[in-house]
């Protein structure tokens, strides 16, 4: 509609009538894994409105229009269940682009006998977690920087469930931590296939240093009667339960990618990442939670200890870290990309890569030049309805076992959602 036409001033007000476009997604998946069928159902509302909850007329089927994101998801099989909820508001306060986010999740895994197929629901491990965070776009040094902060809590409960990750199978652990991250993203044109720019994130996660004020001498726990077995020897299970009642740690991570356009649409992606998990108190040691597991496709597989999966093509999953996980790792990669099509309905591009990486148990063992190498080719397909899908064929140039001189050989990796 045209309003306030001013022939003398040469101005006119144009009023557009807008209709909300549906941006919601429903996820229904089913599959077979771990000798059991697994199903998931989820719903995401990407233009949700909290203000409209009280307005009965706004429920069509849910209140929409404020750009908030609401997600609900359930995944389950015979012995594994995950419930999750998240809410994000990109314009918290309404005046500046400050993002507020909150989430809640509950995971429970029962004892499962893979030989008989029986499930014992009296034996289980569960994790209940919640977080709240704020992220703000910065203007200094430039407009591409974002500062984010979050506070999170996880409650671990083991009921007669020995995972092999800890010396105890009966006990509880609490994890209260604060995370601060500085990120910069100036990738331009297509976010699925950047032709230039860079993106990086530097983050630090801290727990409280409980050992500074709780008065516990963790190095002498084995000398106390309550932490000894019937023979008077130190009971490591009881000692670890005391050590990990409240988790104490700090975690530093860096991840960065640079995109260089060589010619036409041939792009070189240079990528580097690093992570370190440390302890405040040497007598308490590094926690068995939140460790790094390097190798393979990087997809989580019933991870009940907060472990962080790091992809490394050309090698089996988690094969470049010890059984208990790494406390420090690094990874470097070079990737040549060329698009087949970049249409809105589907973006497809091929790639070839070389990369190296390695996980280490202790900081004193860290050597960035002692890395496993790989090379290979891959394909990526992005469709709005399905997200990012892909496949990589990687050739491990080194052996997983340092005493073996033969290369690991070919590995096939499937990509669902995540980037390498």
List each language-model region with its residue ranges:
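Gram-negative/organellar outer-membrane beta-barrel architecture
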Residues: 1-193, 198-199, 310, 325, ...
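C-terminal outer-membrane beta-barrel translocator/porin domains of Gram-negative envelope proteins
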Residues: 7-10, 14, 24-35, 44, ...
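Hydrophobic alpha-helical membrane-association signature
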Residues: 130, 250-252, 330, 371, ...
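Secondary-structure transition into beta-strands, especially the periplasmic turns and strand N-termini
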Residues: 138-145, 260-268, 343-345, 387
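Hydrophobic alpha-helical bundle architecture
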Residues: 335-343, 366-367, 380
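Short Gly/Pro-enriched loop/turn and capping motifs at secondary-structure junctions
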Residues: 341, 357-359, 384-386, 396-400
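Strand-loop-strand
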Residues: 362, 368-383, 389, 401
């Amino acid at each position: 509609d045209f309003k306030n036409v001013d022939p003398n001033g040469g101005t006119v007000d144009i009023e557009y009538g807008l209709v909300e476009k549906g941006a919601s997604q429903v996820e229904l998946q089913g599959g077979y894994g771990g000798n059991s069928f697994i199903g998931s159902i989820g719903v995401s509302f990407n233009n949700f409105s909290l203000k409209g909850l009280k307005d009965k007329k706004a429920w069509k089927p849910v209140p929409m229009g404020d750009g908030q994101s609401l997600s609900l998801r359930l995944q389950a099989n015979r012995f594994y269940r995950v419930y999750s909820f998240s809410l994000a508001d990109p314009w918290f306060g309404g005046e500046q682009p400050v993002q507020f986010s909150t989430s809640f999740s509950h995971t429970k895994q029962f004892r499962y006998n893979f030989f008989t197929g029986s499930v014992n629901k009296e034996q289980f491990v569960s994790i209940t977690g919640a977080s709240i965070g704020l992220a703000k776009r910065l203007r200094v040094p430039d407009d591409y920087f974002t500062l984010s902060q979050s506070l999170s809590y996880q409650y671990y409960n083991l009921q007669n469930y020995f995972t092999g990750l800890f010396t105890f199978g009966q006990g509880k652990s609490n994890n209260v931590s604060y995370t601060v991250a500085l990120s910069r993203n100036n990738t331009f044109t297509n976010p699925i296939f950047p032709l230039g720019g860079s993106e990086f994130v530097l983050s630090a996660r801290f727990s409280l240093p409980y050992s500074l004020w709780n008065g516990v001498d963790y190095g002498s726990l084995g000398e106390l009667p309550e932490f000894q077995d019937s023979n008077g020897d130190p009971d490591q299970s009881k000692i670890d339960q005391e050590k990990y009642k409240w988790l104490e740690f700090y975690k530093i991570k860096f991840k960065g990618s640079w995109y260089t356009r060589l010619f036409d649409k041939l792009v070189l992606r240079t990528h580097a990442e690093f992570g370190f998990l440390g302890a405040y108190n040497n007598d308490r040691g590094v926690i068995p939670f939140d460790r790094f597991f390097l190798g393979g496709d990087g997809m989580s597989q019933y991870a009940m200890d907060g472990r962080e999966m790091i992809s490394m093509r050309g090698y089996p999953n988690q094969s470049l870290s010890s059984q208990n996980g790494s406390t420090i790792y690094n990874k470097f990669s070079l990737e040549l990309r060329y698009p087949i099509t970049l249409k809105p309905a589907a973006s497809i591009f091929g790639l070839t890569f070389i990369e190296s990486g390695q996980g280490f148990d202790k900081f004193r063992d860290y050597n960035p030049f002692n890395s496993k190498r790989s090379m290979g080719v891959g394909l990526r397909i992005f469709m709005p309805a399905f997200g990012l899908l892909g496949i990589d064929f990687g050739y491990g140039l080194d052996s997983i076992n340092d005493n073996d001189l033969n290369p690991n050989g070919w590995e096939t990796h499937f990509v669902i959602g995540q980037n390498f």
